[in-house]
């Protein structure tokens, strides 16, 4: 078919011989390729296709003479085209089979990357073929346009031929030699049959060279491919090896780590096992000891029981003997009676006239016996009952009424009956029961009987005289009783208006007698579970608590949130004891566990322990009202509000009621247990809520907490929301527990070893010394940085205790509690204390203590002595800061006094005038009471703390960097004097200038500033010193009595108490009723009514002899002045310190003013009361007190 096609083309162009020769050479080449593989024949096929394309592109000549021949040839060509199409289909099938075989072999050798390359090559070849087919079709179209007579069929045939040749070009893969030879032989046979035999002789040398080049190129490509493949394989193998190495290394590391962990775990297990064994041994030893103790106790009990039995047996024997003797005596008496009766009968028979005389005598005698037999306590009881109506007055000693009067009172009804009936009854009694004397006389002899008759006559005369005397005494005693009743009524009225020197009783001597009898048993209202132990029991408890293991004994695992139940149980243990040492030990153990297992929860635990949700100066408080809590409790438990209120009146503690209440509502699922984190965050949310809808949201949050509570959690959740935990824990105790926890279980140091209990490595004395040192460091550091969020991380860091004073220093914007002064009894005492020391005297201004903070960005804050933010109360001070601050000052902390000041007269006004200013949202345009700042100390300046510098240098910094401004800012007036007369005159000058007195301070030695401490390096001499007492007291009203007379409708007298910081309780100090104006009585009554409570709080300590009409929850502080202090069996302030059974009381107290700048916990402490009492003894200038003054 190929030869015919080539011949047709050559004839049409002129029958050129060269074309025929080429055709023959091509045929010969095909002949040779029968035995060659298919890849070698590709080059020949390519050359043929290129030559054919060149020929097709040449222009064709026209010949009109050969039209018929052309038509015949066209018909033949059509037939040939059909045959060629069939052959092409066969070739295509064969080619596809060959490609599949070759691809299968290549896939075994090549990787996936080479397959993708082959695919890309095939696609590129196909695209090239498509382009070539398009170019050939375009060339054919040009030829058809030139040839007018040639039909379109010829062009299609040519294109088909070209396609067939190009498809052969696509045979890229090798097939088996046998299959390829067969297909090639068939093709070559067809070509050689049509051509002449001469074609076999001529083969051009050019074709051979071309073939060799093609083969070489292919070989090169194959070599390159193989080399690439080898390189890629090697690279892959290298990567695999590297990966395997890395994996091995990682496995080795993991195995090592696992081994190390296993070793550590083994060590821990061994340690635990050792500890367990030790514990088991200890437990066994304890059990043995307990068994021995029990056996001893049993033996002792048995011995005691034996002794008791023996005693009982002895007693029984004695009783039996006594009974026998009594029986014998009774029998004797009966016999004697019988004999006597016989003798009497005989007498009656012998002497009938004397019968009337005997009966009357016996009547009178029986009447006298009846009078004497009446108990003598009836009138006494009636009088004592009357006396008990007096307000805890000791009963006056009275004479005992005569037995005759008592007998007459009991027998008046019987004497009104007829004498005959009584005479007969009495005579029968007298006959049946004669006196023992007469019986003896009858038994002895008849002479004695006659003697008895004489004695009876004498007794009759005596009884008559006694009856007359008794009648007179009866009348006198009745008059005395009436007078005494009148006196008691008068005393009741007078005692309510005027009490004695102790505030309650009238006579000190009688009180002391009564106190010696009663021994003044004070009642401290504490929970039932509260225990008080002696020193031995406390030490035993401390030893048991000291064996606490912070990890093993904890109820949660490392990294977990601390359950709130752990804190609640700790509170419960602390509430069950009154020992401060045990309380600190319990809290320190909890802190140790939290530091080791969940250190993030430590700060929140501290805040919950002191019943706060943040630093004091942030003024975030819970203080939820009782009404809201009752509603929340009712809704969460399904109980009614009225029932809860009724129980509250009986119990007095809403927390106990909540703990005992069980929810009757069904829940969809179990609530999640409370954690310290969840409780603390909920408390913060409650404190932040305000405005419309705030109360309802608060109730919802409280209900969620209560629903999740278990066991004792409810008790302390409710108390925390009320703001009163009542567990006897002061903030100082919390700091001591923190110090102990860090000392006993210190953080891991550079060595990487964790010490769980350092006490095992130290002696007890050494540990105590170090503990006291750590406590002093911790308390001082916290006084400089009173923010647990900042303080605790420094404390629990590595070497935190050693560096705590340097890391926790003053910071602007964080207020510190001010340094306070000790009161003195006079100038002489002050001079004795400051002998051989330089000191200075400052005016003590009557205002409000203020601490001004100026930040580098220009903002100003003002804080009170309680660390409350009063910036809104004093906007005038904030506005005037720029007037008194020097140009070089960027930041400072100023200690000063804000004093009410009259700018017109330039005089200081009293504190009462200052207290009329509003506390919140004060606007400059509305200020009616202007304020002047009197500065006396500088604590911080331009980024540096000055508290460790002496006062003389701090004062220099103050004067150099601040500017005095009239009516706005002034320096506290001072003088460095030492003469007694000069000090006295300077004190008088201060009093004349409306100041409270003088502040005397050390100037150089021991003159550092000590925050939150009452120091003896500062002493105060107040103007009250000249009037008698050294200093006033700040006390809290906790009870009141209703007024009478002019004071009806108000409270006439109040019960005041001081605050004991160690036990967190209020101790009574006096009953006060003087110093109040009528307006003050009405205002105080209205102000205190919202704070009424049904029962005294657990934190109140009072005597059972004090019973006010109403009780108050602590809400305000009053300044009180008194004549002096005395030991009292009635009041409980500092009880047990100066006297084991008595406290301290104020004599003649009087009200001075309200102290709005102080909270109840900032009231005068019991320790201060003791100091004032001791200083009072030293004071030689004690005032003389008028005995007629009221004791209020």
UniProtKB/Swiss-Prot annotation:
Residues 371-382, 410-434 have a biased composition (Low complexity). The record marks 580, 866, 1046, 1071 as: Interaction with target DNA. One of its GO terms (molecular function) is DNA binding. Its cofactor is Mg(2+). Keywords: ATP-binding, Cell cycle, Cell division, DNA damage, DNA recombination, DNA repair, DNA replication, Ligase, Magnesium, Metal-binding, Nucleotide-binding, Nucleus. The active site is at residue 844. Residues 1162-1184 have a biased composition (Polar residues). Its main location: nucleus. The keyword Metal-binding applies. Its EC number is 6.5.1.1. Mg(2+) 2 binds at residue 996. The lineage of its organism: Eukaryota, Amoebozoa, Evosea, Eumycetozoa, Dictyostelia. Residues 724-733, 918-920 are annotated as: Interaction with target DNA. This is DNA ligase 1. GO terms for biological process: cell division; DNA biosynthetic process; DNA recombination; DNA repair; lagging strand elongation; Okazaki fragment processing involved in mitotic DNA replication.
């Amino acid at each position: 078919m190929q030869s015919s096609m080539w011949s047709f083309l050559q004839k049409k162009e002129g029958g050129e011989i060269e074309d025929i020769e080429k055709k023959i050479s091509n045929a010969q080449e095909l002949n040779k390729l029968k035995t060659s593989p298919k890849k070698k024949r590709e080059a020949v096929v390519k050359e043929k296709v290129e030559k054919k394309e060149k020929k097709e592109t040449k222009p064709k000549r026209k010949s009109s003479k050969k039209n018929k021949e052309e038509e015949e040839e066209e018909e033949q060509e059509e037939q040939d085209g059909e045959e060629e199409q069939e052959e092409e289909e066969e070739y295509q099938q064969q080619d596809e089979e060959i490609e599949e075989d070759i691809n299968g072999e290549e896939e075994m050798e090549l990787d996936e990357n080479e397959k993708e390359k082959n695919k890309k090559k095939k696609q590129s070849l196909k695209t090239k073929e498509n382009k070539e087919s398009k170019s050939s079709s375009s060339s054919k179209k040009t030829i058809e346009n030139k040839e007018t007579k040639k039909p379109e069929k010829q062009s299609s045939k040519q294109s088909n031929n070209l396609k067939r040749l190009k498809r052969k070009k696509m045979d890229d893969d090798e097939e088996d030699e046998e299959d390829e030879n067969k297909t090639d032989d068939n093709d070559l046979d067809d070509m050689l049959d049509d051509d002449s035999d001469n074609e076999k002789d001529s083969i051009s040398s050019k074709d051979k060279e071309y073939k060799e080049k093609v083969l070489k190129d292919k070989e090169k490509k194959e070599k390159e491919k193989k080399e690439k493949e080898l390189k890629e394989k090697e690279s892959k193998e290298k990567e695999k090896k590297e990966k395997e190495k890395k994996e091995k290394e990682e496995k080795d590391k993991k195995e090592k780590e696992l081994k190390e962990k296993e070793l550590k775990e083994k060590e821990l297990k061994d340690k635990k096992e050792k500890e367990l064994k030790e514990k088991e041994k200890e437990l066994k030893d304890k059990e043995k000891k307990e068994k021995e103790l029990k056996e001893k106790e049993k033996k002792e009990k048995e011995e005691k029981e034996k002794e008791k039995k023996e005693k009982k047996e002895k007693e029984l024997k004695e009783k039996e003997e006594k009974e026998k003797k009594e029986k014998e005596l009774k029998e004797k008496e009966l016999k004697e009676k019988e004999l006597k009766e016989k003798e009497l009968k005989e007498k009656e028979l012998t002497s009938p006239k004397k019968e009337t005389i005997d009966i009357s005598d016996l009547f009178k005698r029986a009447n006298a016996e009846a009078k004497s037999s009446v108990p003598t306590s009836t009138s006494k009881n009636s009088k004592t009952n009357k006396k008990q109506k007096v307000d805890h007055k000791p009963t006056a000693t009275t004479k005992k009424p005569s037995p005759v009067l008592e007998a007459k009172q009991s027998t008046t009804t019987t004497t009104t009956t007829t004498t005959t009936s009584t005479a007969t009854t009495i005579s029968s009694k007298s006959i049946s029961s004669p006196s023992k004397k007469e019986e003896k006389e009858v038994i002895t002899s008849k002479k004695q009987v006659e003697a008895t008759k004489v004695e009876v006559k004498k007794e009759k005369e005596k009884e008559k005289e006694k009856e007359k005397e008794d009648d007179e005494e009866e009348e006198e005693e009745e008059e005395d009783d009436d007078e005494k009743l009148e006196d008691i009524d008068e005393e009741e009225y007078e005692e309510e208006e005027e009490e004695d020197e102790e505030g309650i009783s009238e006579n000190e001597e009688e009180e002391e007698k009564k106190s010696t009898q009663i021994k003044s048993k004070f009642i401290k209202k504490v929970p039932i579970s509260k225990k008080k132990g002696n020193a031995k029991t406390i030490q035993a408890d401390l030893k048991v608590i000291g064996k606490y293991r912070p990890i093993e004994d904890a109820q949660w695992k490392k990294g977990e949130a601390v359950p709130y139940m752990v804190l609640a149980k700790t509170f419960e243990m602390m509430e069950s004891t009154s020992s401060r040492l045990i309380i600190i030990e319990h809290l320190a153990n909890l802190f140790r566990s939290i530091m080791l297992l969940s250190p993030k929860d430590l700060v929140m635990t501290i805040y919950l322990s002191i019943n706060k949700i943040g630093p004091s100066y942030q003024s975030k408080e819970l203080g939820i009202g009782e009404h809201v809590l009752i509603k929340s409790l009712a809704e969460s438990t399904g109980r009614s509000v009225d029932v809860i209120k009724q129980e509250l009146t009986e119990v007095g503690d809403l927390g106990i009621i909540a703990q005992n209440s069980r929810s009757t509502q069904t829940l969809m699922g179990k609530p999640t247990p409370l954690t310290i984190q969840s409780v603390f965050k909920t408390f913060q949310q409650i404190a932040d809520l305000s405005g419309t809808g705030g109360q309802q949201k608060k109730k919802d949050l409280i209900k969620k907490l209560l629903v999740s509570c278990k066991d004792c959690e409810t008790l302390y959740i409710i108390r925390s929301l009320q703001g009163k935990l009542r567990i006897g824990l002061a903030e100082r105790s919390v700091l001591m527990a923190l110090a102990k926890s860090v000392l006993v279980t210190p953080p891991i140091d550079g060595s990487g070893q964790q010490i769980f209990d350092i006490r095992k490595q130290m002696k007890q004395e050494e540990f105590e010394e170090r503990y006291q040192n750590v406590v002093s460091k911790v308390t001082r550091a916290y006084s400089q940085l009173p923010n647990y969020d900042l303080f605790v991380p420094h404390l629990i860091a590595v070497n935190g205790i050693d560096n705590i004073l340097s890391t926790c220093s003053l910071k602007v914007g964080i207020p510190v509690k001010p340094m306070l002064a000790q009161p003195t009894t006079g100038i002489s005492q002050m001079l004795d204390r400051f002998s051989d020391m330089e000191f200075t005297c400052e005016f003590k201004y009557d205002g409000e203590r203020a601490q001004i903070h100026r930040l580098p960005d220009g903002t100003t804050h003002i804080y009170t002595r309680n660390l409350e933010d009063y910036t809104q109360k004093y906007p005038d001070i904030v506005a005037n800061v720029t007037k008194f601050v020097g140009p070089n000052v960027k930041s400072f902390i100023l200690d000063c006094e804000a004093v009410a000041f009259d700018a017109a007269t330039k005089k200081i006004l009293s504190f009462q005038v200052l207290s009329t200013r509003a506390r919140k949202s004060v606007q400059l345009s509305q200020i009616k009471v202007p304020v002047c700042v009197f500065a006396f100390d500088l604590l911080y300046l331009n980024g540096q703390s000055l508290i460790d510098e002496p006062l003389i240098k701090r004062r220099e910094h103050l004067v150099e960097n601040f500017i005095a401004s009239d009516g706005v800012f002034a320096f506290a007036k001072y003088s460095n004097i030492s003469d007694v007369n000069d000090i006295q005159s300077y004190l008088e000058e201060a009093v004349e200038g409306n100041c409270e007195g003088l502040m005397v301070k050390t100037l150089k030695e021991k003159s550092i500033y000590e925050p939150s401490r009452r120091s003896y390096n500062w002493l105060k001499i107040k103007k009250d010193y000249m009037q008698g007492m050294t200093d006033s007291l700040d006390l809290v009203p906790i009870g009141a009595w209703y007024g009478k007379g002019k004071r009806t409708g108000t409270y006439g007298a109040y019960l005041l108490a001081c605050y004991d910081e160690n036990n967190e309780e209020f101790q009574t100090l006096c009953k006060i009723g003087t110093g109040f104006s009528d307006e003050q009585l009405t205002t105080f009554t209205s102000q205190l009514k919202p704070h009424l409570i049904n029962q005294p709080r657990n934190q109140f300590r009072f005597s059972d002899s004090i019973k006010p009409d109403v009780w108050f929850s602590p809400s305000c502080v009053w300044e009180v002045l008194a004549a002096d202090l005395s030991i009292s069996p009635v009041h409980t302030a500092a009880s047990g310190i100066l006297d084991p059974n008595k406290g301290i009381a104020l004599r003649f107290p009087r009200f001075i003013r309200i102290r709005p700048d102080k909270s109840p916990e900032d009231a005068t402490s019991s320790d201060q009361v003791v100091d004032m009492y001791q200083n009072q003894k030293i004071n030689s200038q004690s005032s003389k007190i008028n005995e007629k003054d009221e004791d209020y």
